[in-house]
């Protein structure tokens, strides 16, 4: 017990020794502010105390062979504020000597009284106050720059506990107020961020759809494994035209194709007559395409040889009828048939214009007339033979200037037998 009491008395005596030479009225800072030199700080300090600067371990820091003494005051910058927001720091400076006094007199007299001078003005929003060591009654002052200072309370022993408790209560009040302000600032910043995102992120629905269509490459399901891809240029996304311009058909529908009937025309020759099966051609609907393959060509050559064998060398036949027989086997063919396949579904056909009905009817009439011509010629030949037999019997009676009917029929082969008697 004696050792503990002796330690406490030694600490108190040491502290008194540090504070006694520099002790002054605790209201000196308030009196200085009331003097009118510092007009902005009209309101008196809320709390004022004397401190000495120590290090983190509690050891006193000496400056010019003495302790660094400082007066700390917390006050309002304006009467409208409800909570203090300013921290003031003041130091004692020795008073100026008079010039009239001689050096000898100045040495004999006591030193002049020290004067309190305001040296620092710190807003509390840039300062953090906390209790560093409650046993030694030291506080920690941390600035916004990161530097920290440790201050130990310096006052008379019977006032230390009361005054230090006031500082602890003030520090807790200031910290609570800082926490509220920080929360309000965070909420305001978050609201500002949400508002900015609402403003900048607000987009029209049409804008959203256009951007999704531009980001995805257009893929047209053409027929087959090939796909048509088109990349969009952003400044020209409004000028994009549809690529499905082949036939403007949906993807799943198959275009209707007109029926194309391939008909092979078979020609039969019976006794120098060409008979064509025209009934199939007239009844078929759509486009009639005639293909002549090698077999048909061979058949035609054989028919021509048969015609040569059938016709007698002494038979009279006009050259015009031969040319008509040759020309009778005309075939209407459709040329320039181009089939363009796009994959497996789409195709285009380009055909030459189809002949008119008048031309087809004319050809049919020509064919029927050609069929009738051989019959008519055969009857004419028979009549000529009978007439030649009759004329041979009457040659003696006829005069020499009259020509035989056979020669007349050679000139006019199309006349019938009754008209030749005239």
From Swiss-Prot:
Q: Where do Basic and acidic residues bias regions lie? A: 360-374
Q: Name one GO biological process term.
A: flagellated sperm motility
The annotated region (Disordered) lies at 353-404
For whether the record's keyword set contains Cell membrane, the answer is no
Q: Name one Pfam family in it.
A: GARIL_Rab2_bd
Taxonomic superkingdom: Eukaryota
UniProt keywords (A-Z) are: Cell projection, Cilium, Flagellum
The Gene Ontology CC terms held by the record are: sperm midpiece
Task: Report where it is expressed, by tissue.
Answer: Expressed in spermatozoa (at protein level).
Q: Which residues form a coiled coil?
A: none
Location in the cell reads: Cell projection, Cilium, Flagellum
Explain the purpose of this protein.
Seems to play a role in sperm motility.
As for family, the record states:
Belongs to the GARIN family.
What is the annotated quaternary arrangement, including any partners?
A: Interacts with CALM1.
Please state what the protein is called. Answer: Golgi-associated RAB2 interactor protein 2
- Species: Homo sapiens
Species lineage, top-down?
Eukaryota, Metazoa, Chordata, Craniata, Vertebrata
